[in-house]
Amino acid sequence: MQGSVTEFLKPRLVDIEQVSSTHAKVTLEPLERGFGHTLGNALRRILLSSMPGCAVTEVEIDGVLHEYSTKEGVQEDILEILLNLKGLAVRVQGKDEVILTLNKSGIGPVTAADITHDGDVEIVKPQHVICHLTDENASISMRIKVQRGRGYVPASTRIHSEEDERPIGRLLVDACYSPVERIAYNVEAARVEQRTDLDKLVIEMETNGTIDPEEAIRRAATILAEQLEAFVDLRDVRQPEVKEEKPEFDPILLRPVDDLELTVRSANCLKAEAIHYIGDLVQRTEVELLKTPNLGKKSLTEIKDVLASRGLSLGMRLEDWPPASIADE
């Protein structure tokens, strides 16, 4: 195997051992050292907590007002019945919520096969036992709400939010939406040519039958990849630093002093002092101008009057003067 020392190995699906319809082992190799645990732990957490599925969330049993009661002619108490319903494996197509009904009488077990449902619902394990009737005259009728969701949602989180709307006799059930019942991974040593420091990831999992184990791993990998897309397309979202713009000067300050139409004497005195723009002139004080050779009080008065007619005066302060357009000249 030739390649750059910085090039990562890409794993390939080596083997899928289908132990049963709900139990499978998936082997993935080769992986760079350490990536077996990195990928295995990430997939395990997603498979246990983030896989969508369907679960029983509410139950109404005729003649039962609360979960701490019993029903005549039924071997199990209500809490046991709710626990058995919690393990019901249901596959629902095209709907987020369905209501199932169950009516059974006479001695014998009550199983998932006794549930009445429409064509959008499939009971995966019809032999799943819900309760047992112990008397010929015993009967049980119930309405079962099945909803689609993700992860695990205990009934306690819904009690307070639904207290005002939930009628007496409607029993809430802890909802375990995840179709994955058990998952474990193991990292073993792998070898590719001369490299012996590689990983082999072996994932073993069991589902409730509503999803194929191979499909479950495929979905988990898709979820992980979608979450990582934000890092793949990472962009610097920081706001660009806004540079403080220097204040713009009044256009009149950028005009040459010749535009003031001063007398020749005054204009020549200003040019001799390198005062070429009106902006240069207004920053001078009266004392500074009087020190200018050949510029007397009469010329000073003329300059002040001309500036005043334009809304300007001597002794003004102009920050960042001269502007770049003048400084470059």
UniProtKB/Swiss-Prot annotation:
Reactions that this protein is recorded to catalyse: RNA(n) + a ribonucleoside 5'-triphosphate = RNA(n+1) + diphosphate
GO annotations of cellular component type: cytoplasm; DNA-directed RNA polymerase complex
Superkingdom in the source lineage: Bacteria
Key word Nucleotide-binding present: no
Enzyme class per UniProt: transferase
Listed SMART domains: RPOLD (SM00662)
Chain positions covered by the region annotation Alpha C-terminal domain (alpha-CTD): 249-329
Annotated GO biological process: DNA-templated transcription
Gene3D superfamilies named among the record's database cross-references: 5' to 3' exonuclease, C-terminal subdomain (1.10.150.20), DNA-directed RNA polymerase, insert domain (2.170.120.12), RNA polymerase, RBP11-like subunit (3.30.1360.10)
A single GO molecular function term of this UniProt record: DNA-directed RNA polymerase activity
EC number: 2.7.7.6
CDD domains, A to Z: RNAP_alpha_NTD
The UniProt record lists the keyword Transcription: yes
Keywords: DNA-directed RNA polymerase, Nucleotidyltransferase, Transcription, Transferase
Xref: HAMAP family: RNApol_bact_RpoA
Domains (record comment): The N-terminal domain is essential for RNAP assembly and basal transcription, whereas the C-terminal domain is involved in interaction with transcriptional regulators and with upstream promoter elements.
NCBIfam families reported for this sequence: PRK05182.1-2 (NF003513), PRK05182.2-5 (NF003519), rpoA (TIGR02027)
Subunit description: Homodimer. The RNAP catalytic core consists of 2 alpha, 1 beta, 1 beta' and 1 omega subunit. When a sigma factor is associated with the core the holoenzyme is formed, which can initiate transcription.
Recorded family membership: Belongs to the RNA polymerase alpha chain family.
The name this protein goes by in its record: DNA-directed RNA polymerase subunit alpha
The encoding gene: rpoA
